[in-house]
Amino acid sequence: MRDAVTSLIKNYDVAGRYFDRNAIDTLKDYFDSGTARVQAAAAINSNAAALVKQAGSKLFEELPELIRPGGNAYTTRRLAACLRDMDYYLRYATYALVAGNTNVLDERVLQGLRETYNSLGVPIGPTVRGVQILKDLVKEQVAGAGIANTTFVEEPFDHITRELSERDV
């Protein structure tokens, strides 16, 4: 797992270059948002279970066929698996948010997930929608914690949805 700083250093080291203005600006932005990132993580951590439960409720309200007989979240076991996965997305998105880098999502969550879901018959569309709902709820939670600029919260969730979404459709 890398954070924004180690990724930047690695890229410049591989190229054998000193930091240029872009690198310095990237570092400055990362460190300037550091306190907000930690505060956001604290707000998420203190309400993680409620955020997942609320996201699940909203998802099933929007897509009730998922919890009806024959739906992918029908039966207690499948519903629990869906909420467990949403919790994983939230936890790893929080790690990526603090790191300022989505590398942990690629390494620990996304590699092979789409193929696994397809092989198990888990619909990707509702999964993507669930992550989008989580993003909206987290932004509300973070704003409620007094963090004015919540745009940095979007990137981990947007990364998950981009990587899971259909391509070349």
From Swiss-Prot:
Biological processes per GO annotation: photosynthesis
PTM info: Contains one covalently linked bilin chromophore. The chromophore is added by phycocyanobilin lyase CpcS 1.
One GO term describing the cellular component: plasma membrane-derived thylakoid membrane
Entry-linked CDD domains: APC_beta
Membrane topology: Peripheral membrane protein
Subcellular localization(s) per the UniProt record: Cellular thylakoid membrane
Key words of the record: Antenna complex, Bile pigment, Chromophore, Electron transport, Membrane, Methylation, Photosynthesis, Phycobilisome, Thylakoid, Transport
Pfam families (alphabetical): Phycobilisome
Residues bearing the modification N4-methylasparagine: 72
Chain positions recorded as (2R,3E)-phycocyanobilin binding sites: 82
Function: A variant beta-allophycocyanin (AP) which forms a complex with ApcE, a phycobilisome terminal emitter that influences energy transfer to photosystem II.
Complexes and interactors: Heterodimer of ApcE and this beta chain.
Family note: Belongs to the phycobiliprotein family.
Protein's recorded name: Allophycocyanin subunit beta-18
Originating organism: Nostoc sp. (strain PCC 7120 / SAG 25.82 / UTEX 2576)
Lineage of the species this protein comes from: Bacteria, Bacillati, Cyanobacteriota, Cyanophyceae, Nostocales
